């Protein structure tokens, strides 16, 4: 048995300004999703569509009113409304107590911080809301009408009590967040309904909708060689999530609040360190395109190897989170720290890739300390696994071999989860064999 991927549709996801905030263009996203589903129906010809399942980034959400209508469309975590959080609500709860409750890294982008900001500045929207749904949940809801979230999203939101496994209603009340808006949590991947949407492609009518693969990083972990405990995995896309499987929750051993304990499908847990990822180079490319300089990520990766610049930036510095011009911020950082200033795109690429690799070296040390595991390899998945230069630098800075692939880890993990739910795959052992039979893994980057 093996999996064959065929891309039906691909589109850009961009941030727009709405009411003075950085928001996702939800109407555009919906339009493109349904276009993609229609194309998939056409591409499969007479073959039956067995199921549909959605994965997305975590944290961001929309609000439904009591009539079930989306009245508050998703705002991006890159909006400045959570600036200073969670430290600014320390009078309500300290960061130490917060971590003890949910085991999530202290970060301003979490759903909790966004909702706290709304409670302070937009309370009317929260009182009007009937249910909160995360991005992939909204897609599922639009397809089948079921307002349900899944375990992977809930544990990432900073609102699940890690000891009880339920929504932390006491915490929500402290923050001024109405607990009535928190949806039912689906802890086991399963069919939650069938597609029943006006105007949908006829082939999709009554097709099962599967929930359980919400958080993209969590579902990407299904593509990792999890039969080998001494392999760490790095999901490297816009964000970078470096993690490993964790057999039990033990908050007492974690003294670093940049570590998160996140739920994975089928009740598993993972220890994760998060970092900015390819966002830095993505924003540089966007700025170059605006200025008429056209390049590709593959070309930048190749040319970075020929650049002689050795400057290093602190990739998680706040200045790089949502700048107007990423290239200017990198130049200014190098000036301020007395380093060589990048000039050509290849120089910027080398600075970014080297700096990311150095950061991952720091994070792997943290992960080894907390997990008690000395990792023998790192498996890099998602888009960054295609970047040979970056993967070689990761191996160099981390000091252990790097395995790369699959590049489309989230899509593949999503398909694997559906296949398990629909009884196409029996268990984890069969899943592992199918992954190994289906995809090429490069084990060529050694420190």
Question: Can you annotate each of these PLM segments?
Answer:
Residues 175-190, 415:
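A conserved helix-loop-beta module that forms one wall/lid of the active-site cleft
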Residues 3, 47, 180, 229, ...:
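Structured loop/turn residues at beta-strand edges in well-structured enzyme cores
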Residues 46-56, 131, 184, 370-382:
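Short glycine-rich phosphate-binding loop at a beta-alpha junction
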Residues 75-94:
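Short alpha-helix plus adjacent loop in nuclease-associated cores
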